[in-house]
Amino acid sequence: MKNVLIIFGKPYCSICENVSEAVEELKSEYDILHVDILSFFLKDGASSMLGDVKRGTLIGNFAAHLSNYIVSIFKYNPQTKQMAFVDINKSLDFTKTDKSLVNLEILKSEIEKATYGVWPPVTE
């Protein structure tokens, strides 16, 4: 069973689309799940199944810790049911306007370094 990369992006975001396209190159190593963050957090979105308290905590955590990320990536281990935050910002080159804006070697390194169960995320 492969680990899963969960990509939280925004609709109509060209950077999010380019990141998603680049990360697809890792599909031989990971299952990849793309999540539209706006739809996810809508009142009737998938996050509503968490209940009001957990949903509110999740929204608060996103706002407090991930608001400076255009796109967020987590890795998920389906066997242990643990998640880890992946610091994608280290792999992005914003001077590029296509999927090459993601340095896949750096991203792979960040995925491997991401520690399960650490929250809030440790960023440099």
Swiss-Prot record:
Q: Where in the cell is it found?
A: Host cytoplasm
Keyword Cell cycle assigned to the entry: answer is no
What factors induce this protein? Expressed in the intermediate phase of the viral replicative cycle.
Q: Which domain of life is it from?
A: Viruses
Q: Where mainly found? A: host cell
Pfam families in the record = Glrx-like (PF05768)
Could you tell me which cysteines form disulfide bridges?
13-16
Cellular component, GO annotation: host cell cytoplasm
User: Gene3D superfamilies, from UniProt?
Assistant: Glutaredoxin (3.40.30.10)
SUPFAM superfamilies in the record? Thioredoxin-like
Q: Which UniProt keywords apply?
A: Disulfide bond, Electron transport, Host cytoplasm, Redox-active center, Transport
State what this protein does: Glutaredoxin necessary for virion morphogenesis and virus replication. Functions as a thiol-disulfide transfer protein between membrane-associated OPG128 and substrates OPG095 or OPG053. The complete pathway for formation of disulfide bonds in intracellular virion membrane proteins sequentially involves oxidation of OPG072, OPG128 and OPG088. Exhibit thioltransferase and dehydroascorbate reductase activities in vitro.
Quaternary structure, per UniProt, is:
Homodimer.
Q: Which family does it belong to?
A: Belongs to the glutaredoxin family.
User: What name does UniProt use for this protein?
Assistant: Glutaredoxin-2
Query: Which organism was this protein described from?
Result: Cowpox virus (strain Brighton Red)
Name the gene that codes for it: OPG088
